[in-house]
Amino acid sequence: MNKSTIRELTFKLLYSLEVQKSFENEDIDLYFEDIELDSEKVKEEIKSEVNEIINNNDELLKQISNNLKSDWKIERISKVNIALLKLAMYEMLNKKLPYKVVINEVVELAKKYGEDTSSSFINGILATVVKENNLQA
């Protein structure tokens, strides 16, 4: 299973947890009941990343809020966009993955799962995060 597929599955789990407003291990385990994965290792990789995002939730939400236009509130952002932004910010800031790859793939996920404006909205926020954090390619 390639990294893009793992990223998409990670996003889907994050989105599911956002909708449920529950971040318990039981809910994470429930997600995997209906999904066939290549290996237990892939499952553990996804679970680990989701748990790290949950552990960094407050900081990630703060980063999102700090990068919104002044007249926007975080409550206005769709659950799809929140999940995608958390995933991208975690991968760029915490895992130090190449931001160009992360942004490209998350924008593609936004086109697939988000609203018409999701991809440009996410691209704009993440471009600001890259600039503010002096991320290198």
Feature-to-residue mapping (PLM):
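N-terminal interaction/assembly modules
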Residues: 1-119, 123-137
